[in-house]
Amino acid sequence: MFATSILRSAYPAYKSPYGPKYQYQPHIDGITPKQLVRILPTAAAWTGVALFAVVYYASGIPRLRRDVLQRIPYLGERYFVNEIPASDNPF
């Protein structure tokens, strides 16, 4: 007989004026820009704390101290230089 899509296309779907007004909301994997703006400061703070902790715990490694920490302007030459006194040097 007749296809159901032909019969239904004659009558538009009823849309109540009191119902919700749906709009497209942009997102990336379900994270909207509003959520991203709310989460970013917290994520940045935790990232900074984690970076500080890694550098603090790894500051005893001579290679990291020499290649990374001593190259920090103003701080590197004052705080991260490890000078061993001649009396403690076994050679």
Swiss-Prot record:
Its predominant location is mitochondrion
- How does the protein associate with the membrane? Single-pass membrane protein
The UniProt entry, under InterPro entries, shows: Cytochrome_b-c1_su10_fun (IPR019182)
| Compartments it resides in | Mitochondrion inner membrane
Give the protein's biological function: Component of the ubiquinol-cytochrome c oxidoreductase, a multisubunit transmembrane complex that is part of the mitochondrial electron transport chain which drives oxidative phosphorylation.
Mitochondrial matrix side of membrane: 1-34
**Coiled-coil stretches noted in the UniProt entry, renumbered to this chain:** none
Does Signal count among this protein's keywords? no
Q: Which family does it belong to?
A: Belongs to the UQCR11/QCR10 family.
Q: A Gene Ontology biological process annotation?
A: mitochondrial electron transport, ubiquinol to cytochrome c
Query: What GO cellular component is one of the record's annotations?
Result: mitochondrial inner membrane
Whether Mitochondrion counts among this entry's keywords is: yes
Q: What is the protein's quaternary organization?
A: Component of the ubiquinol-cytochrome c oxidoreductase (cytochrome b-c1 complex, complex III, CIII), a multisubunit enzyme composed of 10 subunits. The complex is composed of 3 respiratory subunits cytochrome b (cob), cytochrome c1 (cyt-1) and Rieske protein (fes-1), 2 core protein subunits pep and ucr-1, and 5 low-molecular weight protein subunits qcr6, qcr7, qcr8, qcr9 and probably NCU16844/qcr10.
Q: What is the protein name stated in its UniProt record?
A: Cytochrome b-c1 complex subunit 10, mitochondrial
Query: Which sequence ranges are listed under topological domain Mitochondrial intermembrane?
Result: 59-91
Which residue ranges run through the membrane? 35-58
Cystine pairs annotated here are none
| UniProt entry keywords in alphabetical sequence | Electron transport, Membrane, Mitochondrion, Mitochondrion inner membrane, Respiratory chain, Transmembrane, Transmembrane helix, Transport
